[in-house]
């Protein structure tokens, strides 16, 4: 059974409808000697981000090669200016409209990827999103004493910075 829908004619109704443009998203990391962690972190981003920006603080391991394997835009700054300044420097290399910060030892779960994709389908341009972080200490996740969910601000439009 088909449906026959008609819309009232409006001025400009002959203009073709344009698809809504999805904003671009960059994953951004600052790293040093993270070869043991980086591959799994970057693999967890597959299909979600438009660019990966990595600012390296002077790795002596395979970190640069792993970043290249994932097509990351890789920059180096070995003069450590402090955590905040290093993050701002990394973000200055971002070309995307939105920023997702990660540490190399973090992974996106399938549920978190889906939640981020949902937000990115129709994001609020004036909102900074927090992500629940589950900490792993001494071989166990910490889910007590107020440690979970440890919410961290990680997803936001670059224009807000």
Task: Tell me what each language-model feature is.
Residues 14, 38-42, 60, 85-88, ...:
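A generic local structural motif
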Residues 39, 61-70, 111-112:
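Acidic helix N-cap motif at the loop->helix transition within catalytic regions
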Residues 29, 50-58, 75, 104:
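Short beta-strand/loop segment that forms part of the nucleotide-sugar
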Residues 44, 56-66, 79, 103:
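A conserved acidic beta->alpha catalytic loop
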Residues 8-10, 84-92, 97-102, 109-161:
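Catalytic-site signature of metal-activated, phosphate-bearing donor transferases
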Residues 50, 64-93:
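Conserved donor nucleotide-binding strand/loop of the catalytic core
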Residues 2-44:
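N-proximal low-complexity "stem/linker" segments adjacent to membrane-targeting elements
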